[in-house]
């Protein structure tokens, strides 16, 4: 989860987020190596008085600085495309949850259960209990089973929203009249926080998302108590 003064990514809790974290490190290393090379070349040019004023053409150099960037782009593109296809895959979900964005709250419907739906509003700061997080707590959490593929159908009732949970590697736009989908899967139990990530009006900052991932038997008990 997130913590104060955090500079890096949140701890990965899903296979997709683990892949995204590895890809981030992979790309950042390439950027670091390129930046180091450019800095070395600039430093060398400034430190020497030697120049090549008579050089009119250097085909070998032109070949190198054409092919090398192309190879680097391929090394970035291939893992990126792999992750994009992984994020679009939804294989045999055990549960489907429909998520609707509103100004300024979320509503959830468990389509596999009859009459299991609720709205999720942010808990005002004055009503928070000790230890709860400001602007991130909700009155109704989304309870889901861990270690199982879950399909989220995401749309909006009014304006553009975006349903995002960083530690699970999720960010899907909620568009009026359009149904987007995403796969939710967690490697471990716990509370995972997110927020609306698309400017949607004056209370955009007050649309938190809380997923409570629990073992399957606890989810079955919860769903039975809600119906």
UniProtKB/Swiss-Prot annotation:
Its main location: mitochondrion. It is found in: Mitochondrion inner membrane. Binds a dinuclear copper A center per subunit. Keywords: Copper, Electron transport, Magnesium, Membrane, Metal-binding, Mitochondrion, Mitochondrion inner membrane, Respiratory chain, Translocase, Transmembrane, Transmembrane helix, Transport. Its cofactor is Cu cation. Signal peptide: none annotated. InterPro entries: CcO_II, CcO_II-like_C, CcO_II_C, Copper_CuA, Cupredoxin, Cyt_c_oxidase_su2, Cyt_c_oxidase_su2_TM_dom, Cyt_c_oxidase_su2_TM_sf. Residues 1-14, 88-227 are mitochondrial intermembrane. Cu cation A1 binds at residues 161, 196, 200, 207. It catalyses: 4 Fe(II)-[cytochrome c] + O2 + 8 H(+)(in) = 4 Fe(III)-[cytochrome c] + 2 H2O + 4 H(+)(out). One of its GO terms (biological process) is ATP synthesis coupled electron transport. Residues 46-59 are mitochondrial matrix. SUPFAM superfamilies: Cupredoxins, Cytochrome c oxidase subunit II-like, transmembrane region. It is a multi-pass membrane protein. Its EC number is 7.1.1.9. Mg(2+) binds at residue 198. The chain crosses the membrane at residues 15-45, 60-87. Cu cation A2 binds at residues 196, 198, 200, 204. PROSITE patterns: COX2, COX2_CUA, COX2_TM. One of its GO terms (molecular function) is cytochrome-c oxidase activity. Belongs to the cytochrome c oxidase subunit 2 family. Component of the cytochrome c oxidase, the last enzyme in the mitochondrial electron transport chain which drives oxidative phosphorylation. The respiratory chain contains 3 multisubunit complexes succinate dehydrogenase (complex II, CII), ubiquinol-cytochrome c oxidoreductase (cytochrome b-c1 complex, complex III, CIII) and cytochrome c oxidase (complex IV, CIV), that cooperate to transfer electrons derived from NADH and succinate to molecular oxygen, creating an electrochemical gradient over the inner membrane that drives transmembrane transport and the ATP synthase. Component of the cytochrome c oxidase (complex IV, CIV), a multisubunit enzyme composed of 14 subunits. The complex is composed of a catalytic core of 3 subunits MT-CO1, MT-CO2 and MT-CO3, encoded in the mitochondrial DNA, and 11 supernumerary subunits COX4I, COX5A, COX5B, COX6A, COX6B, COX6C, COX7A, COX7B, COX7C, COX8 and NDUFA4, which are encoded in the nuclear genome. This is Cytochrome c oxidase subunit 2. It comes from Acomys wilsoni.
